[in-house]
Amino acid sequence: MTSTIVQICRDCRSTLGEKRARCPHCGSPRLFAHPEWDKLAIAHVDCDAFYATIEKRDDPSLMAKPVIIGGGRRGVVSTACYIARIHGVHSAMPMFKARAACPNGVIIKPNMEKYVKVSREVRQLMLELTPLVEPVSIDEAFLDLSGTQALHGTPPSLTLMRFSEKVEKEIGVTVSIGLSFNKFLAKIASDLDKPRGFSAIGEAEALDFLGPKPVTILPGVGKAAAARFGREGVSTVLDLRRLEPRRMVSLLGNDGMRLTRLANARDDRRVTPEHETKSVSAETTFETDTRDAEVLLPILMHLSEKVSARMKTSEFGGSTITLKLKTSDFRLVTRSRTVSAPTNLAGRIYQAARALMQPELARGPYRLIGVGVSELVPAEEADRGDLADQSVAREAGMERAVDSLRARFGQGAITRGLVFAARQTGDKGRR
């Protein structure tokens, strides 16, 4: 095959010799064209509104309704379907704001055991394409399909189109795929055409593509960083490229050099298979800097749930919990502690992270919060407990029992008291 092809139908994968609005073979309007279609091999696969899509799959009566996954007035949104997003609901939004923005929304408490099971099914299909699969979270991963054309008989782009169709037909969820020559641009490409998207950013176009984009397209640049750049006369990626590297370092430290590389479409990170993974983490950047425990602690619980879900999906436990904070002046604060036994339970991750957070609350405000687990071990070595510390075994048993009851009787059968506990200052973070 050569790169002279104009269009490929994403549904029947016919190759079309001239530009058309629809495929003449199957009538689909989902046509893909790119001059580097047979060369690009780094992909980012992102499941569309993953939790909400699973709930709609399992209850078709929800299909046309705005579904919001989350719970408790003081909790945060885990996922919102695309209908709810039209009303302004988004991930990590406080639930009371989500209810106000979308009063007709159907609120469903997350069923992590179910979501982890589906995530593993999707991951297994990824591994049929390439062993180089790097999970990013429960619903997204990077894949490196370099050298797989001999195995599959097609370039990565066509292989990924077949994969997308297979996931939708066999598992009942949809994915958006970004294809490029590095991870940074593959991630951006996957966001260009959601849901059920398939987009590519090639090497020849990368600088021109990025140039006019706002600096917020770069990972880690939120409103506060954008405002700081604005004071330097920088609003676009092209503006940022024109800043002297020395000035970037003075503004943002090591982050400045990282952003300079990304602004120039350079990203040397490899796709790292999960057996090489050293840590599992999740983080979020706030629209407004805050030191308010009423805001920070529920989000800390949300992030702990995300890390726990990914660890269970990847079958890891870990013994070192790390809290990551970034101040309003971009100073990075990290605090770590080692727990008594490796864990992948959300409650234990949250307890450790919350203890690390308490002394830092007065030192904010913060623009970013993150939680990570490292010193990874196989999942069967996690949460065993021992004779010297029976509380570990009891806590692990309680959380597993809750997971089991929720799997049998629904997520509402038992409600975790962590969000209530987040309002306290002297408890153990659980009820």
Model region roles, listed by residue range:
Residues 1-261, 271, 309, 392-431:
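Gly/Gly-Pro- and Ser/Thr-rich, intrinsically disordered tail segments characteristic of DNA damage-repair
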Residues 1-6, 35-36, 44, 210, ...:
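DNA-contacting surface of Y-family translesion DNA polymerases
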Residues 48-50, 73-75, 328-331, 376-379:
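Short, charged/polar surface micro-motifs in flexible loops or helix N-caps
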Residues 106, 142, 322, 338, ...:
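Short aromatic/hydrophobic contact patches that present stacked aromatics
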Residues 141-147, 334-337, 378, 383-388:
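Short, hydrophobic beta-strand segments
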Residues 151, 185, 331, 379-381:
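Residue-level signal for secondary-structure boundary sites
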Residues 180-184, 262-265, 317-328, 366-377, ...:
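A glycine-rich phosphate-binding loop feature that marks nucleotide/adenosyl-phosphate handling sites
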Residues 341-431:
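Acidic, metal-coordinating catalytic segment for phosphate/diphosphate chemistry
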